[in-house]
Amino acid sequence: MASTEGANNMPKQVEVRMHDSHLSSDEPKHRNLGMRMCDKLGKNLLLSLTVFGVILGAVCGGLLRLASPIHPDVVMLIAFPGDILMRMLKMLILPLIISSLITGLSGLDAKASGRLGTRAMVYYMSTTIIAAVLGVILVLAIHPGNPKLKKQLGPGKKNDEVSSLDAFLDLIRNLFPENLVQACFQQIQTVTKKVLVAPPSEEANTTKAVISMLNETMNEAPEETKIVIKKGLEFKDGMNVLGLIGFFIAFGIAMGKMGEQAKLMVEFFNILNEIVMKLVIMIMWYSPLGIACLICGKIIAIKDLEVVARQLGMYMITVIVGLIIHGGIFLPLIYFVVTRKNPFSFFAGIFQAWITALGTASSAGTLPVTFRCLEDNLGIDKRVTRFVLPVGATINMDGTALYEAVAAIFIAQMNGVILDGGQIVTVSLTATLASIGAASIPSAGLVTMLLILTAVGLPTEDISLLVAVDWLLDRMRTSVNVVGDSFGAGIVYHLSKSELDTIDSQHRMQEDIEMTKTQSIYDDKNHRESNSNQCVYAAHNSVVIDECKVTLAANGKSADCSVEEEPWKREK
């Protein structure tokens, strides 16, 4: 009793816990702010290193230009880590396109895939037309071209003319490759050749041909030969991205229709996609060094940078202002109008992809990084990104359309050619279509510029005058292309979210039904086994269990508590 009272009189210990927010810190607030900044930089370490690499490459390149002329081998060694980065990124393009398209489309039905593709194409065409029209308006308003520039820059190099019809037919041919393996490293192109054709009389009569040869030896003028332009199809180096995308879109849709039969293949490509994305993460940690070396090497290799900047400064400003307006105002505005979400928080999520595009100048090379930014940072459904991004990296080139429209009218202004309304519309439409057909590789805009200049009858040799500044503008327009693809994925995901949720609920219901069927089959099997176990001793009156005899009841299912030891046990 005394012990009980002593226990009751003991002081009770009460543990009081307070939330961290109620505790005052002795550390100054500015230190907390600094620690928060360090924590944020730590979480975004890769992004911070990439931005630092861009700045470091530009600063080092500018300082090295001030030094004495650098040997080309030294420049090559400086840019070598950047070349390795580009090779690694391009190495992943093919497996990433294959796995992403198949896994994205196999999880959708045919109707959902069609709606997804329609929304993406409407967005692509709309933004590309807006970019081309913006470029035309800016170049006409600023008027950077001047006939005096043509005299300062000198004549350009002669280029082969390209037919718009041939380019369009090549686009369709590449969409349907005859050999899928060959499409991984080659694409088809129409080539025009000038061939000397002898007159028919020379071909028909061998005697006259011999006489003609004798006349040539006797310094007599032979019959004139004709120059005939012949067209032919040739394969050129470069991945046929358009053909691969077309095939694997059809492959993914067909696999999605097969349902459970293709489950093993879907799992295989899902695993392949995950492996590729893990490789992407490894390469991204190398990208700050590679991007710094790429930019530094490019700046060192430029000849007469100051002279080029003075001569083509207004042209560069026109293109850059147009890209900033389109990528910084129009695209975020379209995203906000459609989704009613903050476009700048969206841009913060894709900043890593934007910086990578600025350094590599390749939409296809940036594709692995763009996948990771949209899926991990912004939480966009993989079925959307895996379909929208590969297609967008190939045909959605807003920055390229704007650049080509500005460049074409700039060349016209340099040559003193005044374009009428019809020609300006032609430039806008051709720039839109040419940007869609441009391959997602560096400096593809210069190649497609031939189409636009040929369409309005401008000299194609003047394209070579713009090569000196294309290294910078190519990076700027590629970064806008990547931003446009990313905003497009966000818009398509917002418009398709309800349909994707419906598909997910249907899949869950189907899985529940399959699980219920499996459980019922399992229960039936167990029930049959239990019945068979109960009846196994039905023909016996007693059994021996643990050295004891158990007498069974008449029904053979239960014992009447008649348990006795065996006689020899009792005798012991």
Curated annotation (Swiss-Prot):
It is found in: Cell membrane. The gene is Slc1a2. Glycans are attached at residues 205, 215. The modification Phosphotyrosine is found at residue 537. The keyword Metal-binding applies. Its main location: membrane. A lipid is attached at residue 38 (S-palmitoyl cysteine). Residues 1-28 are annotated as: Disordered. It catalyses: K(+)(in) + L-glutamate(out) + 3 Na(+)(out) + H(+)(out) = K(+)(out) + L-glutamate(in) + 3 Na(+)(in) + H(+)(in); K(+)(in) + L-aspartate(out) + 3 Na(+)(out) + H(+)(out) = K(+)(out) + L-aspartate(in) + 3 Na(+)(in) + H(+)(in); D-aspartate(out) + K(+)(in) + 3 Na(+)(out) + H(+)(out) = D-aspartate(in) + K(+)(out) + 3 Na(+)(in) + H(+)(in). Homotrimer. Interacts with AJUBA. The modification Phosphoserine is found at residues 3, 21, 24-25, 505, 520, 530, 532, 542, 558, 562. This is Excitatory amino acid transporter 2. Residues 344-374, 424-457 dip into the membrane without crossing it. Sodium-dependent, high-affinity amino acid transporter that mediates the uptake of L-glutamate and also L-aspartate and D-aspartate. Functions as a symporter that transports one amino acid molecule together with two or three Na(+) ions and one proton, in parallel with the counter-transport of one K(+) ion. Mediates Cl(-) flux that is not coupled to amino acid transport; this avoids the accumulation of negative charges due to aspartate and Na(+) symport. Essential for the rapid removal of released glutamate from the synaptic cleft, and for terminating the postsynaptic action of glutamate. Disruption phenotype: No visible phenotype at birth. Mice are born at the expected Mendelian rate, but gain weight more slowly, especially after the first 30 days after birth. Only half of them are still alive 60 days after birth. Death is due to spontaneous epileptic seizures. Besides, mutant mice display neuronal degeneration in the hippocampus CA1 field, probably due to impaired glutamate removal from the synaptic cleft. Glutamate uptake by synaptosomes from mutant mouse brain cortex is reduced by 94%.
